C-alpha cells in the first residue's frame, strides 16, 4: 500500500515521503496512530496544502523533546527493591518502574520510551538506561538500584 508519512517514522522515512508498506502495517498501525495517510491523488494535494502546518508541528514536538531531554540528560534515578545478600533482586526493575519513577519526578515519559539495552534490571547497582523522547532525541539516564534487606 502506498502511504504519505505525516511525521518522521523510524526506519521508514520523513514527513511527506510517499512510501510503500505492507497493508497490515498501514491499516493496523500507521493510519490509526495518525502517522500516515493513503497516498491517493486528493490526499497528496491536501497534504501539500497542509505541509507547512505539519512541519511546524513537527518542529514544535522536536523542540519540546529537546527541552525535556536537557533536563533528563545525566539524571541519576534511585530505586529500591527487595534484594538478597548476594545483590540479586527478588523480581526485577522494568521499564514500567523507571517510567513511573520519572513521572513521579515531573517528567512526561511513557514506558515505551524507556529503552533497556540489557533487559530488566536484576541486580543492585548502577545501570545505564536510554530514554527516547523523540525519534531524534535520546538521553542517557543512570538508574541506581538499592537493595532493601529482607
UniProtKB/Swiss-Prot annotation:
Q: Does the keyword Metal-binding apply?
A: no
Q: Which UniProt keywords apply?
A: Ribonucleoprotein, Ribosomal protein, RNA-binding, rRNA-binding
Task: List the GO biological process terms.
Answer: translation
* Listed GO MF terms: rRNA binding; structural constituent of ribosome
InterPro entries the UniProt entry points to: Ribosomal_bL9, Ribosomal_bL9/RNase_H1_N, Ribosomal_bL9_bac/chp, Ribosomal_bL9_C, Ribosomal_bL9_C_sf, Ribosomal_bL9_N, Ribosomal_bL9_N_sf
Q: Which domain of life is it from?
A: Bacteria
- One matching Pfam family: Ribosomal_L9_C
Q: Does the keyword RNA-binding apply?
A: yes
What is one GO cellular-component annotation here? ribonucleoprotein complex
Q: Which SUPFAM superfamilies match?
A: L9 N-domain-like (SSF55658), Ribosomal protein L9 C-domain (SSF55653)
The function of this protein is: Binds to the 23S rRNA.
HAMAP family found in the cross-reference section: Ribosomal_bL9
What does the sequence similarity comment in the record state about its family?
Belongs to the bacterial ribosomal protein bL9 family.
Protein name, entry field: Large ribosomal subunit protein bL9
Species lineage = Bacteria, Pseudomonadati, Pseudomonadota, Betaproteobacteria, Burkholderiales
Gene field:
rplI
Amino acid at each position: 500500500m502506498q502511504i504519505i508519512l505525516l511525521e518522521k517514522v523510524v526506519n521508514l522515512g520523513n514527513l511527506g515521503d510517499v512510501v510503500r508498506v505492507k497493508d497490515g502495517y498501514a491499516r493496523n498501525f500507521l493510519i490509526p496512530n495518525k502517522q500516515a495517510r493513503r497516498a491517493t491523488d486528493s490526499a497528496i494535494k491536501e497534504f501539500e496544502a497542509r505541509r507547512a502546518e505539519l512541519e511546524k508541528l513537527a518542529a514544535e514536538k522536536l523542540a519540546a523533546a529537546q527541552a525535556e531531554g536537557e533536563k533528563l540528560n545525566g539524571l541519576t534515578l534511585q530505586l529500591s527493591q527487595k534484594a538478597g545478600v548476594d545483590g540479586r533482586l527478588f523480581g526485577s526493575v522494568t521499564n514500567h518502574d523507571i517510567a513511573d519513577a520519572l513521572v513521579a519526578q515531573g517528567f512526561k515519559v511513557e514506558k515505551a520510551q524507556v529503552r533497556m539495552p540489557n533487559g530488566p534490571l536484576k541486580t543492585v547497582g548502577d545501570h545505564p538506561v536510554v530514554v527516547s523522547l523523540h525519534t531524534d532525541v535520546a538521553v542517557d539516564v543512570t538508574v541506581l538500584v538499592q537493595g532493601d534487606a529482607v
